[in-house]
């Protein structure tokens, strides 16, 4: 790497790395703790940014545009705790599977602090609609739990 590259890299990823809302959901493999674990942002920052730019007309002109953008932004801060291997597998699915289907595709089972099996909150509909249009993906029909933006505060 070039000299000083790590500083530029860290600065570009500051929001992504330093801003997170912990769901306190962990994959069953991460709970076992036999491998290296990491945080996974449920929505990648580049995915959120690209969706916002491609839908700027909605976010700028729609009466509730800011609310829709803020909901997307909040979801982009949600993190789970998974194994490094699971995180790497999830990263490879961008543009191949809808975000709402990725954990199922990799076979990641999540649990909360008490050990109860849980589901990820559904990403905002605008993201799923955008992924279908942008990447030509098919909807599997899987319907994750929908959470209003105000209720995302439960994770803070």
What are these regions, as identified by a protein language model?
Residues 48-59, 84, 90-94, 114, ...:
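Generic local-structure boundary detector
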Residues 72-98:
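Short Cys/His-centered divalent metal-binding micro-motifs
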Residues 32-74:
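Histidine-centered nuclease catalytic patch
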Residues 1-35, 98-101, 105-115, 121-152:
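Nuclease and nuclease-like effector domains acting on nucleic acids or nucleotide cofactors
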